[in-house]
Amino acid sequence: MPEKYINFTPPLSLRSGHLQSLLGSSGLRRRAVLKRAVALQEAAEVWTLDGGDGIRLQGYYSKHAEGGRGLVVLLHGWEGNVNSNYMLGTGARLYGAGFDVFRLNFRDHGDTHHLNPGLFHSCRLGEVVHALSDLQDRLGASRWGLAGYSLGGNFSLRVGLKAGEAGLDIGRIVAICPVIDPAKAMDSMESGLKFYEWYFERKWSRSLRAKAICFPELYGQETWHEIRGLRARTHYLATKHGYAGAEEYFDGYSIARGRLENLSV
């Protein structure tokens, strides 16, 4: 990596992490990203992957006509999707550098609510591993790269733990700001600026309503989107999926307390 990147320090006016988060989702940023991602998006094909047990996950595959330098799979964060600014920006940079890029949507992210009856939750690791195995087999990929942001970073590292037994030939994993301890992340969100909890609560409500529209026979009478507070809503939905409550659910996808010790990628 060039030294100018290793030693980079943002201008004083842009050092606030909160400001960087806001600017990252701004309209100005969006226009710049879309301009850079034209080639990536023009090359993109919609692929539906086998997640096992009838589960389907969808993503976008951008391949170089003359053969690329290798495959990189990108995983987005919670309530993001394959067209989030950071996914397009990273994908465009990788594609421009000669890599084939696959951007995977998690269940119920993007416009995929109709693909599976069950709701997304962060402990659904098996379907992501199965889908990536399907992708690897279909492409004949070897020593491919996996990168994820936030919750996607958490998934990437957990996929790495399963890589050996699943036969995934992952050469490198990059996790950007991964969720390490979900319980502590929730504590921080509740004690920090209320904007973040409001932002995710609003996006999650929209997603849950979309799910109910796709499967009215299953969720038409549910009022989960009306439960205020991320912890309360998480607790309610966790109990619907076999967990004692939010804390047990958080522990189910935590990678804290030595759980990455056996990561060999």
What are these regions (language model features)?
Residues L88, A92, V129, L157-L161:
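Short, hydrophobic alpha-helix immediately C-terminal to the catalytic nucleophile
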Residues S26-G67:
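N-terminal cap/lid segment of alpha/beta-hydrolase-fold proteins
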Residues M1-V33:
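N-terminal presequences and immediately downstream first alpha-helices
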Residues R56, S62-L115, D134:
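Short, surface-exposed "cap/lid" segments of acyl-processing enzymes
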